[in-house]
């Protein structure tokens, strides 16, 4: 039998918060708002899961806006155990913004191209978004016209920040 007693000690109080966004996404209003409204504030008790959640939310939002290379150049929480204090420093480097380029639709020759494109939640030249690709796939699936729907894009094929997308459709059997 093993008995363990843990003394968590006193919580650390946040004495400083510095959250910055750099790169081409620094001028994005939503990223600036998330950085300035970071939920952990000076004077609050450090809650690490809340820190991780807020940190992930900022990076996820950058990616949703098309900054697929967004990564933290600095992400640290310096805790002074003796002083029971913590300083949070985050620096998100967004990298370049990506956009959709061409959208190739394959596998549904019986449907006009303009008809199929109505189901897409994105257009060429719009900011790249995995969420919009997923929404497009869902809309095409929900149309019940296709047995299989694949909406994909390969960032490795990007040229000048523009990523081509493919929509691959397998029509459902015709119901008469």
Regions found by a protein language model. Name each.
Residues 1-176:
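Periplasmic polypeptide-binding modules associated with outer-membrane biogenesis and secretion
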